[in-house]
């Protein structure tokens, strides 16, 4: 019996046909692999595998066991087509896992049933893992069928799909009232049969009462459904909008601005006239709120008419609310000479220093406004004073000491975007337990779902935090 085997080391695959009869190599032997001799590759001796053969992932393997050591354990369940121990492509270090493909599908099923979580190899703390690899474990025999006639029964759907192979399951999705939702799941006995049904039926016809043509595709796996839920949740948090990330906190700010604008306009309207300063402030609010609603930082509006507001005044909305004017980490105006912050300088001496970019353009304006006092004071500060009382400063955040879960429950996450904080992390990982998990099962579930999860331009790398006595925590 000849077995195709390969060892992945430094990114290279070494394929050879190995003799398993315990004898040495033939005179024409071309070399050795892992201490075993092999004969020259003869195409007639290369084993063939079933079209629906399953590729198995083997986990919890001692790092001192190679293909030649693992082969006797697995070949009792059938003829092996390929056995590959995974090694680091850079260091050549054994990763403690392997891929195994039998020539026959039944052999893989028997091996999984007999070994998975049933036997612990020497030197390991957990039993061996034998399960379909990710590429095989997806529901590649199970189809989702959409745009069905809601009057169709399971028997009708079976008759539609039975021409392509043996159907193991057929289920129509129904609502609480028992009525069909117009979709179903159909499970074949092999991937090839399911693929044939997709090729023949997807988009081929429109069922009576359906709004579009028939939909036939592979059903999502649990992992894919989890990822979709996470992406939807992350999208609601604004994580995938590159402009919303830095400024998402201003959503409430923008809403407050809109409310304050309405109150301000009502206040000045009661006085029977529109104070120029109040009008400018209201317009400034509207501009900032509109921009913030779109997730963009607001830039102060500069008046263009010569008779309304001095050019140096760029009034923020309310002193009691932090101004969002400051993009990409740049802060606003520096503190003024009289000790008042820049955000309140407009209430102090009336006019900010005007940085003249063009002396010929700026000097006449400065001369024109040199003797102008602050516009009628009461309306502008008074209106803001009334409004700002409704928006008190939030109490200062008291930093809390970081807490850790028990050993084996703490995750270390690489490649986080710089703008991520504890709140964003908690929202992302909350469905799997808590940020520090209280049990290993939740931590492992989070790793499976979130490792490789893409946020913006980066993919998360999530793994168990190493023990405290290790040289580094990750």
Curated annotation (Swiss-Prot):
It comes from the Eukaryota. Residues 18-41 are annotated as: Disordered. Gene3D superfamilies: 3.30.70.330. Keywords: Activator, Cytoplasm, mRNA processing, mRNA splicing, Nucleus, Repeat, RNA-binding. GO terms for cellular component: cytoplasm; nucleus. Residues 18-28 have a biased composition (Polar residues). Its main location: nucleus. Residues 228-247 are annotated as: Necessary for TNNT2 exon 5 inclusion. It is found in: Nucleus; Cytoplasm. Residues 1-287 are annotated as: Sufficient for RNA-binding and MSE-dependent splicing activity. PROSITE patterns: RRM. SUPFAM superfamilies: RNA-binding domain, RBD (SSF54928). GO terms for molecular function: RNA binding. It holds the Pfam family RRM_1. Residues 54-135, 141-221, 392-467 form the RRM domain. GO terms for biological process: mRNA processing; positive regulation of mRNA splicing, via spliceosome; RNA splicing. RNA-binding protein implicated in the regulation of pre-mRNA alternative splicing. Mediates exon inclusion and/or exclusion in pre-mRNA that are subject to tissue-specific and developmentally regulated alternative splicing. Specifically activates exon 5 inclusion of cardiac isoforms of TNNT2 during heart remodeling at the juvenile to adult transition. Promotes exclusion of both the smooth muscle (SM) and non-muscle (NM) exons in actinin pre-mRNAs. Activates the splicing of MAPT/Tau exon 10. Belongs to the CELF/BRUNOL family. This is CUGBP Elav-like family member 4.
């Amino acid at each position: 019996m000849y077995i195709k085997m390969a060892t992945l080391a430094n990114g290279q695959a070494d394929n050879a046909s190995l003799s398993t009869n315990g004898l040495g190599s033939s005179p024409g032997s071309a070399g050795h692999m892992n201490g075993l001799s092999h004969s020259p590759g003869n195409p007639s001796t290369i084993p063939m595998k079933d079209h629906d053969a399953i590729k198995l992932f083997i986990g919890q393997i001692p790092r001192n066991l190679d293909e030649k050591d693992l082969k006797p354990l697995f070949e009792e369940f059938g003829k092996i087509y390929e056995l590959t121990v995974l090694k680091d492509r850079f260091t050549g270090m054994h990763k403690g896992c392997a891929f195994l493909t039998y020539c026959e599908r039944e052999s893989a099923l028997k091996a999984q049933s007999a070994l998975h979580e049933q036997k612990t190899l020497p030197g390991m703390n957990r039993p061996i893992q034998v399960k379909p690899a990710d590429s095989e474990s997806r529901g590649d025999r199970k189809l989702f069928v959409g745009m069905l006639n809601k009057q169709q029964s399971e028997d009708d759907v079976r008759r539609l799909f039975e021409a392509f192979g043996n159907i193991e399951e057929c289920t129509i999705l129904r609502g609480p009232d028992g009525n069909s939702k117009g979709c179903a799941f159909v499970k074949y006995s092999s991937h090839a049969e399911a693929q044939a049904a997709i090729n023949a039926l997807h988009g081929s016809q429109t069922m009576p009462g359906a709004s579009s043509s028939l939909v036939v595709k592979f059903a999502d796996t649990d992992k894919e459904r989890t990822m979709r839920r996470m992406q939807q949740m992350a999208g609601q948090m604004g994580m995938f909008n590159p402009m919303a990330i830095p400024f998402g906190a201003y959503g409430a700010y923008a809403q407050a601005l809109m409310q304050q604008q309405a109150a301000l306009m009502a206040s000045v309207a009661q006085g029977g006239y529109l104070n120029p300063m109040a009008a400018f402030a209201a317009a400034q609010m509207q501009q900032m709120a509109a921009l913030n609603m779109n997730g963009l930082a607001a830039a102060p509006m500069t008046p263009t008419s010569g008779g309304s507001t001095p050019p140096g005044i760029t009034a923020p909305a309310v002193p009691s609310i932090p101004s969002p004017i400051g993009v990409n980490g740049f802060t606003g105006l520096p503190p003024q000479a009289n000790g008042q912050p820049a955000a309140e300088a407009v209430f102090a001496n009336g006019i900010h220093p005007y940085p003249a970019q063009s002396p010929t353009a700026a000097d006449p304006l400065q001369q024109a406004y040199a003797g102008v006092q602050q516009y009628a004071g009461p309306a502008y500060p008074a209106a803001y004073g009334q409004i700002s009382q409704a928006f008190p400063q939030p109490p200062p955040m008291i930093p809390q000491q970081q807490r850790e879960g028990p050993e084996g429950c703490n995750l270390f996450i690489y490649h986080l975007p710089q703008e991520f904080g504890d709140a964003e992390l908690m929202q992302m990982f909350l469905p799997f337990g808590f940020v520090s998990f209280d049990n290993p099962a939740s931590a492992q579930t989070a790793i499976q779902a979130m490792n490789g999860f893409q946020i913006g331009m980066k993919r998360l790398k999530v793994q168990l935090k190493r023990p405290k006595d290790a040289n580094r925590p990750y």
